[in-house]
C-alpha cells in the first residue's frame, strides 16, 4: 500500500516510478479521491462540532427560559443527527474507494532496478559454480524419476488431476532430506527462527502481503472462505500484523518449511510435464522484518543465505537482478536464483528474494518504535525462498545423474539419507 501523503507531496515522482512498471499515471485520480475524502471528513467534524455546541446552547437557553430558542436549537441538533449517518456512509464509501485504488497499484522500484519489459531484460549479477562435465546424455528429471521407479504422475493424476506428483521410497526420502537440510542450515547457521504456522489464512492475511485483491485467481479458496497459502511468506510476514515492535529487537528473521498451493491460472500449456510447475509443492521460506535503515543490507544477506543452499549442494546457478517488468507486485527490488538444469539445457528459477520497503507493512499496519521515540514507523519486510524443495530435487536428479541411470546423493545430504549414497532403480 502506498502512502497517500507522500503521493500528494510527490505526484510526478510517484507517476514516474510506476511508469517504469508500465502503470498509467494514477496520482491525479488518487489525490482527487483523497481531497474528496478529506472534504467529507471535514464536513463530519464540522457537524459534530456544531452538534456539541448546539447541545450546550440548548442548556443555556433552557436556563434563561428562552424556550423558543431552545426548540430551534433542538431542531437543529435533530437535523444534524439525521444527516450524520449519510455523511458517515459517504466517508466509508470514499475511503474504501481510495484504499481499493491504492491497494491495486504495485510497489515502486528502487532506482537501481533495471528497466525492462519481461524476463528477457533481467540482468545477471553473478554466476556460481560449473556445469556438470560428464559425457553421458542429459535427461529431464521426469525421465530419470520414472526410470528409477520412484516418480509416478499417473497415480497422482488418478488422485488429484494434473500438476501433481507422487514420490515414493528413495525419492520421497530425498525430498524430505532436502527440506530438512534447508531448514537446519537457516536455523543453525543463518540465524532464522523456525515457525510452524497454519496453511490456511483469512482475507486480511492475503491482503497484507499483496496477494489480494488483484491475484485471487492464482489462489485456492476453501468453502468456508479461507485461503490455502501460496507461500509461507503470507503467514510469516503477517505474524507481526497490527503490532508495534521494539526497534532494538529488529531484525526478526523467520523461516518455515511448508507446502505451498497455487492454481497456476496463468500457466496453461507451460511446463505441463514433470514437477516444475505444480499445484502443491514444498518450499523453505525466509522472511525478515527490519527497520528502514537495515532493509537493503538485509536483502543482500537473505539472498546470500539462499545462495548458500545451492553452493552446499554443489549446483551451478546464476543470480539475476529482475527488471521492473518482471518483479512481483509487492517488491521494490528482487534477486532471482536460477539453477542449471542439464536436461532442459537451461536455467530455471529456484529462489526469489525481494525487499518490499514498507509496502506490506502499511497494508498490515505493522510498525516499530525506537527506544527514545514517541512516534512509530512502519517496518520494512523482506521475503525469499531458501529454496523451492521440488525444484531443488529436480536439479539434483539432473545434475547428479550417472551413466547407469542412478543418481548420486550430494555429500551435504548424506546425514539425512540413512546410509544411502546413491539412488538406484527399484528392484
From Swiss-Prot:
Catalytic activity reported: tRNA(Ser) + L-serine + ATP = L-seryl-tRNA(Ser) + AMP + diphosphate + H(+); tRNA(Sec) + L-serine + ATP = L-seryl-tRNA(Sec) + AMP + diphosphate + H(+)
Membrane-crossing segments per the record: none
One GO MF term attached to the UniProt entry: ATP binding
CDD domains, per the entry: SerRS_core
EC number: 6.1.1.11
EC primary class: ligase
Span of the signal peptide: none
Main location: cytoplasm
Localization terms from the record: Cytoplasm
Domain of life (superkingdom): Bacteria
Single Gene Ontology BP annotation: seryl-tRNA aminoacylation
Binding annotation for ATP: 262-264, 349-352
Cellular component, GO, one term: cytoplasm
Record key words, sorted: Aminoacyl-tRNA synthetase, ATP-binding, Cytoplasm, Ligase, Nucleotide-binding, Protein biosynthesis
Gene3D superfamilies, A to Z: Bira Bifunctional Protein, Domain 2, Serine-tRNA synthetase, tRNA binding domain
Residues at which L-serine binds: 231-233, 285, 385
This protein's pathway: Aminoacyl-tRNA biosynthesis; selenocysteinyl-tRNA(Sec) biosynthesis; L-seryl-tRNA(Sec) from L-serine and tRNA(Sec): step 1/1
Subunit structure: Homodimer. The tRNA molecule binds across the dimer.
Annotated function: Catalyzes the attachment of serine to tRNA(Ser). Is also able to aminoacylate tRNA(Sec) with serine, to form the misacylated tRNA L-seryl-tRNA(Sec), which will be further converted into selenocysteinyl-tRNA(Sec).
NCBIfam families: serS
Family matches, as PANTHER family: SERINE--TRNA LIGASE, SERYL-TRNA SYNTHETASE
UniProt remark on domains: Consists of two distinct domains, a catalytic core and a N-terminal extension that is involved in tRNA binding.
Family statement drawn from the similarity comment of this UniProt entry: Belongs to the class-II aminoacyl-tRNA synthetase family. Type-1 seryl-tRNA synthetase subfamily.
Protein name: Serine--tRNA ligase
Phylogenetic placement of the source organism: Bacteria, Pseudomonadati, Pseudomonadota, Alphaproteobacteria, Hyphomicrobiales
Gene: serS
Amino acid at each position: 500500500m502506498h502512502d497517500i501523503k507522500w503521493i500528494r507531496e510527490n505526484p510526478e515522482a510517484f507517476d514516474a516510478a510506476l511508469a517504469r512498471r508500465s502503470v498509467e499515471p494514477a496520482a491525479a485520480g488518487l489525490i482527487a479521491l483523497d481531497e474528496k475524502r478529506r472534504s467529507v471528513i471535514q464536513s463530519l467534524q464540522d457537524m459534530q462540532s456544531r452538534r456539541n455546541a448546539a447541545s450546550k446552547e440548548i442548556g443555556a437557553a433552557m436556563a434563561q427560559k428562552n424556550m423558543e430558542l431552545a426548540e430551534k436549537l433542538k431542531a437543529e441538533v435533530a437535523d444534524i443527527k439525521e444527516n450524520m449517518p449519510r455523511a458517515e456512509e459517504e466517508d466509508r464509501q470514499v475511503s474504501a474507494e481510495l484504499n481499493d485504488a491504492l491497494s491495486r497499484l504495485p510497489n515502486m522500484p528502487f532506482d537501481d532496478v533495471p528497466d525492462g519489459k519481461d524476463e528477457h531484460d533481467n540482468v545477471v549479477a553473478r554466476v556460481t559454480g560449473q556445469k556438470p562435465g560428464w559425457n553421458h546424455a542429459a535427461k529431464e528429471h521426469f525421465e530419470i524419476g520414472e526410470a528409477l521407479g520412484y516418480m509416478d504422475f499417473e497415480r497422482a493424476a488418478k488422485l488429484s488431476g494434473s500438476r501433481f506428483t507422487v514420490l515414493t521410497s528413495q525419492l520421497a526420502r530425498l525430498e524430505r532430506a532436502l527440506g530438512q537440510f534447508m531448514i537446519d542450515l537457516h536455523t543453525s547457521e543463518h540465524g532464522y527462527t523456525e515457525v510452524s504456522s497454519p496453511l490456511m489464512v483469512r482475507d486480511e492475511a492475503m491482503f497484507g502481503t499483496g496477494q489480494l485483491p488483484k491475484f485471487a485467481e492464482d489462489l485456492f479458496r476453501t468453502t468456508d472462505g479461507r485461503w490455502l497459502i501460496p507461500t509461507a511468506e503470507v503467514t510469516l510476514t503477517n505474524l507481526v500484523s497490527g503490532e508495534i515492535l521494539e526497534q532494538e529487537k529488529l531484525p526478526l528473521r523467520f523461516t518455515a518449511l511448508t507446502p505451498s498451493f497455487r492454481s497456476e491460472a496463468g500457466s496453461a500449456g507451460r511446463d505441463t510435464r514433470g514437477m516444475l510447475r505444480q499445484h502443491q509443492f514444498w518450499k523453505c521460506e525466509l522472511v525478515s522484518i527490519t527497520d528502514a535503515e537495515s532493509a537493503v543490507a538485509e536483502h543482500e544477506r537473505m539472498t546470500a543465505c539462499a545462495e548458500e543452499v545451492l553452493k552446499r549442494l554443489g549446483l551451478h546457478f546464476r543470480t539475476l537482478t529482475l527488471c521492473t517488468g518482471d518483479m512481483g507486485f509487492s517488491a521494490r527490488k528482487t534477486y532471482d536464483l536460477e539453477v542449471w538444469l542439464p536436461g532442459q539445457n537451461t536455467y530455471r528459477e529456484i529462489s526469489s528474494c525481494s525487499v518490499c520497503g514498507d509496502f506490506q507493512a502499511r497494508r498490515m499496519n505493522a510498525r516499530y518504535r525506537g527506544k527514545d521515540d514517541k512516534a512509530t514507523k512502519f517496518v520494512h519486510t523482506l521475503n525469499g525462498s531458501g529454496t523451492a524443495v521440488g525444484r531443488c530435487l529436480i536439479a539434483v536428479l539432473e545434475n547428479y545423474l550417472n551413466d547407469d541411470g542412478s543418481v548420486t546423493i550430494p555429500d551435504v545430504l548424506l546425514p539425512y539419507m540413512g546410509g544411502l549414497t546413491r539412488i538406484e532403480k527399484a528392484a
